A protein has these predicted regions:
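Sec-dependent bacterial lipoprotein signal peptides
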Residues: 1-17
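Beta-strand-centric surfaces of beta-sandwich/beta-rich domains
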Residues: 82-398
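Ser/Thr-rich, Pro/Gly/Ala-heavy low-complexity intrinsically disordered linkers and tails
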Residues: 19-87
Length: 398
């Protein structure tokens, strides 16, 4: 995947809004009173109850282990003309990895990450991801990464911090002890040989004794000959907001179109620590639309729900997504757009496939930041993408 258009759009954000906005520091990640932790976790789980989640100490779900065969190979795939598939293709191979282990005292809360290389010698097609979360897990996020150096020892990290630059693409977010995300039949993400992945684990020890944090992740692949369409991502949002200190705020409704050929099979929203909601609707601009996100699932910024669609959402000419983001700025400084933990974001990403395959797409609503750019800027579609590429190639000048 060519990440340059994505990075170009991030540069555009930086040029428009800068990256030096101030805000209050992130709250401490360690709670001094374990009893407070237990109360908070129970409240969250009782309120959320997303897809039957009971926390990492709940009863294990029954999941069949897919067969582990040899590498699926790198045969050429025709993703231009997907056909209806009557049966789900068999799993060709499974690639396992994990994050862990580290010890946690009662009441301790922390987020750690690893960067690891999978052992696929050839290009493979991933159609499902299974996670198995250990005791005390709050949630785990799995990314496809463009990094080249492994960091196999867990290190402290902050959720989603590196998604905007294009180096990490979220593939799965889960808070359930055992869960499998399956793409539609014959739809798969392409993994390059020895694909790098990033695993982010948020752990919370609400037990009276020490625990050992650990989570397993498995990627299930299908043969290249069974791939009918390549899965990819739509990354949509706006940097047009300035959240007043000590106040609630929302962006108002924005609209971004979607290719007519796209079939969206899952969607999730994204903010930073002050975010209270990302609302998304499906339909034509300036007409009545259907609410599709988050529906009856509560939105938590660090464990945003993933809504799946079966059948997938379809789009006619002029249709797309209408969305708005909301925040509660409990700090004492205004907060604007940025990638740091002390700034905010308003984004959502959608998993899709199409005929022909159109690849990764990122769209923004510039809003009042720079009205001359129009209602939306999309890369790689917009002429501005090539201008920014020229800017980069020129070392910061045209």
């Amino acid at each position: 995947m060519n990440l340059l258009p994505f990075s170009c759009c991030f540069l555009l954000f930086s040029l428009l809004v800068g990256c030096d906005a101030e805000s209050t520091p992130v709250a401490s990640s360690v709670s001094p009173d374990p009893n407070d932790i237990i109360t908070d976790v129970s409240s969250v789980l009782d309120t959320a109850n997303v897809d039957g989640a009971d926390g990492a100490d709940g009863p294990d779900s029954e999941t069949a282990d897919p067969p582990k065969d040899e590498d699926a190979g790198s045969a050429a795939v025709d993703t231009d003309n997907p056909e209806d598939i009557s049966t789900r293709p068999p799993v060709a191979a499974t690639y396992d990895t994990f994050i862990g282990d580290w010890d946690m005292q009662p009441g301790q809360e922390i987020t750690k990450c690893v960067l690891k290389r999978l052992e696929n010698e050839n290009e493979v097609w991933v159609t499902g991801i299974t996670t198995d979360l250990g005791q005390g897990s709050h949630h785990v996020i799995v990314y496809r990464s463009a990094e080249t150096e492994e960091k196999t020892e867990p290190f402290d990290c902050f959720p989603f911090l590196e998604t905007l630059g294009g180096n990490t693409i979220p593939l799965m977010i889960t808070q359930i002890p055992q869960e499998t995300l399956e793409f539609p039949d014959g739809v798969a993400f392409k993994f390059e040989p020895n694909q790098m992945v990033r695993i982010e684990a948020h752990y919370l020890n609400y037990y009276p004794e020490d625990i050992t944090a650990h989570a397993d992740v498995s990627f299930h692949t299908i043969d290249a000959a069974d791939v009918e369409a390549e899965a990819n991502m739509l990354f949509y949002g706006t940097p047009d907001f300035n959240i007043p200190a000590g106040e609630t705020y929302d962006t108002g409704w924005f609209f971004l179109d979607v290719w007519k050929e796209a079939k969206v099979f899952a969607i999730t929203g994204h903010t930073h620590q002050y975010g209270t909601n990302v609302e998304i609707k499906h339909g034509l601009q300036n007409e009545d639309k259907i609410d599709i996100y988050p529906l009856d699932k509560p939105f938590y910024w660090d464990e945003a729900p993933l809504i799946q669609f079966d059948p997938p959402l379809s789009f006619e000419n002029g249709e797309g997504f209408e969305y708005r983001c909301s925040w509660n700025n409990t700090g004492d400084k205004n907060v604007t757009f940025g990638e740091s933990a002390n700034q905010e974001m308003c984004f959502f990403w959608a998993y899709y496939y199409s005929a022909p395959s159109k690849g990764y797409r990122m769209c923004i609503n510039p809003g009042d930041i720079y009205t001359q750019l129009g209602d939306q800027v999309c890369c790689p579609d917009n002429f501005l993408c090539s201008l920014i590429e020229e800017y980069l190639a020129g070392g910061g000048s045209f």
